């Protein structure tokens, strides 16, 4: 199959297994959920009545004081006491096989091609790290909400895009399922397409 280059009167020959496969919604959903879960920190901790610092001594005798009976100062109803159902650190990570992950990326890339959301160009960059220059270039291409994928991070391009809310720059190694579906369009260079094919086999 061929992908038409937007900035040249030519087309790029690509593998149908990477850019022309059927969309597997269940697989993409599973991988995206796992990716988001793996990004969770999960670090939270509260202490139960067994873990708070304090004496184990009964605060006052059972009868005769006129006060409500109490057996510990570490109970949940006491100020400084433990929490009834204390939250603990959790590991939210989900395992995703390499084959599944690559399959999800192929599914997403193929769907981007079908929906005409994948824009392939011969090359892309800016001469200076100027946001204004990049904005004008994207406007000429009628792109606003876009992920730019290059073989390696170009510093000028990265700095120019840093202040644009709906623009992100990634190298091929930095793409992931969430970033690919988060933007309206994905702008990718011809060299990056070849690298993606090599990476996904």
Swiss-Prot record:
GO terms for cellular component: ribonucleoprotein complex; ribosome. InterPro entries: Ribosomal_uL4, Ribosomal_uL4-like, Ribosomal_uL4_dom_sf. The keyword rRNA-binding applies. Residues 45-71 are annotated as: Disordered. The keyword Ribonucleoprotein applies. Keywords: Ribonucleoprotein, Ribosomal protein, RNA-binding, rRNA-binding. GO terms for molecular function: rRNA binding; structural constituent of ribosome. One of its GO terms (biological process) is translation. Part of the 50S ribosomal subunit. Belongs to the universal ribosomal protein uL4 family. One of the primary rRNA binding proteins, this protein initially binds near the 5'-end of the 23S rRNA. It is important during the early stages of 50S assembly. It makes multiple contacts with different domains of the 23S rRNA in the assembled 50S subunit and ribosome. This is Large ribosomal subunit protein uL4. It comes from Shewanella loihica (strain ATCC BAA-1088 / PV-4). The gene is rplD.
